[in-house]
Amino acid sequence: MLINRNKQCIIKNKYSKGKIKVYTDNMIVGYPIKDDGEEELNEILDNVSEYQFNLALEGLFVRGGVSVGDFYINEDIVFGPALLDAHNVESNLACYPRIVLDDKTVSRLQKYINNYDIAPQKNKILIDNDGKWFLNYLNRVFKYYTQCNNQYEFEKMQIELLFKHKVKIEEMLDLHKENIRVWDKYVWIANYHNYFCNINFENEKELRIAKNKLLSWPRGISNNDT
């Protein structure tokens, strides 16, 4: 239900050329590009980031892959090498709740970035410890400026959204604390959250997730264990 409700983040209106296909808990997005594809790729990265952000605020942390290449989608079928590439990235490289770009997409972005002194794409993407480029979806908190009457309202809205994001992560950490494989994925998202807040909201200490929540502590044997 959440996936369907937030689809408009990606396909904004009936005039959009993008197409979406949803099945079970998966979503496929196809978007045509022209010329060098910079405008379209920027748009789809923004829209998918917004979609990912909205789902995260509801406690649904998703992973995915982005590829560029030949692809066909209609109401009945989807196929093409770009679909296989994106699926491979999602299945084998994303690992954590992140949307990872494949090598072809990274190459395009590198070309775009080199055309600017201050490239707009740099705020859309982060590079993880394993070298993978992934969507910096929390950067979407900065889109709300035009919806606020002044800077104070804007900052207040940003902090409220990030605090909600923090709470959802903490809920997941607590829920999965006895399943180390799942819990580790939320540790990753917590570290991403803290990184973003440290860089952009250094003075808002209440937005940080405490480090002791991100460690797996051993304990002694209690009466309840015997």
Which residue stretches match the model-derived regions?
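Catalytic NTP-binding/metal-coordinating core of nucleotidyl cyclase/transferase enzymes
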Residues: 1-53, 57
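A short glycine-enriched loop-to-beta-strand structural element that forms part of the catalytic core
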Residues: 21-30, 60-74
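A short acidic (Asp/Glu
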Residues: 32-33, 74-81, 110-113
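Residues that cap or initiate secondary-structure elements
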Residues: 35, 72, 105-107
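Catalytic-core segments of nucleotide cyclases and related cyclic-nucleotide turnover enzymes
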Residues: 38, 42-45, 52, 73-90
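Short, conserved, surface-exposed binding loops centered on an aromatic residue
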Residues: 54, 91, 125
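Catalytic/regulatory signature loops of cyclic-dinucleotide turnover enzymes
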Residues: 57, 63-64, 68, 85-103
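Intrinsically disordered, glycine/charged-rich C-terminal tails and inter-domain linkers
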Residues: 96-226
